[in-house]
Every structure is written in structure tokens, then in C-alpha cells.
């Protein structure tokens, strides 16, 4: 995108609630555009999701994929309907297909307390919440998508963790944390895994520690914890960095 060009966004409303929430999401972007100098959005809507699959046999047409390739960003609504499934009984999920097409390996999910909204987390109202979950979105069990083996008696999926994808996830996460610190926000990067049980996750944690050693001392402190511990930790804390 050139400096004077509009920011082109591919809009994929999806199904059900996705269609419902897309309209106010676009209104928010339009208000941002109206109050921000030199910022212009260009929206192009395209089909994707379970309803499109039911009508055409494809989760999204080639024209949608081409649009996503050419756009600066993709604004994606919720996709999938429990009553509409592939022959293997899995749901229609173009959002996952897009991850593989465009190597969208880092799923960034910020969590903040909305003023006035109640929270089940102890002390949240007084201490606040500022938590960002960064999840690898193309490997793990996602790598087995469409490849699992199901028999009458059992089902098997293969979990995959590679050094290449893990290291770029960690590098992204450290840089993200450093940017937060530069803005004056609290920051601590924690690797959450199942290294206490599985060799694959012990490998994952080992690579995380190796990556942490490559960053300067100014980088926020790091740590690791298993998922059960993480769940208890989050449930009992009013704030996380």
C-alpha cells in the first residue's frame, strides 16, 4: 500500500453471528477513518463460510481467495454452522484454511477489562486486566487437519511442532512484548505448554528458552508453565502481564 492509497480490506462476514457483528465493526472503522487524517479504507465484501459451502460445495470461491491475496488485510466474521458439515463430519472453517494459505502462524488475542463490565476474575475491577495470548495457529493438531484416521474403534490425529514455525512464533512474541514495554505497558512473556507430560512440548519449551537467550537483557522477564497451572493462575489473579 502506497502512502496516499486507501487501505484495502477484504470483508468476509461469514455465517450467523459473523454477519450480525460485521455491520457494527465496519461502522467503527468508518468512524476511525472519519476522525483520522490521511487514513482511508476501501472495503470489498466476499463470500465464505458454511452457507456458501451448502450452496456451492466450496467453503469460499477462488475469487475470495484472490481478493484476500490482493488486500492489505482480511476482516473475517465467525464462520461455520453446526448443521452444515464436510463429509468427514468436521465443520466448515475457511478461517483455518486461510491460516494455511497465508501462513498466519501467530494468533494474537488481547484481553482487557471493559469499564463497567463484570468479571469472574478475583480483584479484576480494582487491578484491571491486560493480557495478550499469542497462539501458534498452523501447527500442533492443526497440522493434522483433514489427515486424521478414524476407524470404528478409534481415531488418531498427529500433533506437529517444528523448529522453523516455533522460532518465528517466539521471535514475533518477543518483539511484540518489547513494543508493549516501549509504550509503557507492563510485560512478561510466558510460554504455556504441556512440557510436563509430552516430549513435543518439552521440545517447544526448549526452543522458547533458546530464543529468550538471544534477546537483550532489556527484554521483559520470561517464564514457562504448564497449562493446568496456567488455568489456576489466571482464575486466581486480577491482572496479568
For each feature predicted by the language model, list its residue ranges.
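Glycine-rich phosphate/diphosphate-binding loop of Rossmann-like nucleotide-binding domains
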Residues: 4, 10-36, 151-228
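Short, well-ordered secondary-structure micro-motifs
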Residues: 144, 200-202, 233-235
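N-terminal beta-loop-helix "entrance" segment that forms/cooperates
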Residues: 38-61, 231-233
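Acidic, glycine-rich active-site loops and adjacent beta-strand->loop/helix elements
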Residues: 47-54, 80-82, 195-198, 227-229
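N-terminal glycine-rich phosphate/adenylate-binding segment common to multiple enzyme folds
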Residues: 53-159
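General small-molecule cofactor/ligand-binding pocket signal
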Residues: 42-46, 109, 190, 222-224
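Short coil/turn connectors at secondary-structure junctions
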Residues: 4-8, 39, 69-73, 104, ...
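Glycine-rich phosphate-binding loop
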Residues: 65-83, 218-241
Amino acid at each position: 500500500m502506497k502512502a496516499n492509497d486507501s487501505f484495502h480490506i477484504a470483508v468476509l462476514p461469514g455465517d450467523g453471528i459473523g454477519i450480525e457483528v460485521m455491520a457494527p465493526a465496519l461502522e467503527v472503522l468508518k468512524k476511525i477513518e472519519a476522525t483520522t487524517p490521511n487514513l482511508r479504507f476501501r472495503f470489498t465484501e466476499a463470500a465464505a463460510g458454511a452457507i456458501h459451502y451448502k450452496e456451492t460445495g466450496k467453503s469460499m470461491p477462488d475469487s475470495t481467495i484472490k481478493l484476500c491475496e490482493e488486500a492489505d488485510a482480511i476482516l473475517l466474521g465467525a464462520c461455520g454452522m453446526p448443521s452444515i458439515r464436510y463429509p468427514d463430519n468436521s465443520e466448515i472453517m475457511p478461517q483455518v484454511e486461510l491460516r494455511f494459505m497465508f501462513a498466519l502462524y501467530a494468533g494474537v488475542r488481547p484481553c482487557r477489562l471493559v469499564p463497567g463490565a463484570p468479571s469472574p476474575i478475583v480483584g479484576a475491577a480494582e487491578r484491571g486486566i491486560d493480557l495478550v495470548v499469542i497462539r501458534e495457529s498452523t501447527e500442533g493438531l492443526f497440522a493434522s487437519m483433514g489427515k486424521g484416521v478414524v476407524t470404528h474403534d478409534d481415531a488418531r490425529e498427529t500433533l506437529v511442532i517444528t523448529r522453523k514455525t516455533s522460532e518465528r512464533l517466539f521471535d514475533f512474541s518477543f518483539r511484540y512484548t518489547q513494543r508493549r514495554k516501549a509504550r509503557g505497558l507492563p510485560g512478561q512473556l510466558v510460554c504455556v505448554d504441556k512440557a510436563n507430560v509430552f516430549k513435543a512440548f518439552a521440545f517447544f519449551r526448549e526452543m522458547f528458552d533458546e530464543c529468550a537467550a538471544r534477546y537483550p537483557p532489556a527484554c521483559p522477564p520470561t517464564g514457562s508453565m504448564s497449562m493446568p497451572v496456567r488455568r489456576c493462575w489466571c482464575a486466581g489473579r486480577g491482572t496479568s502481564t
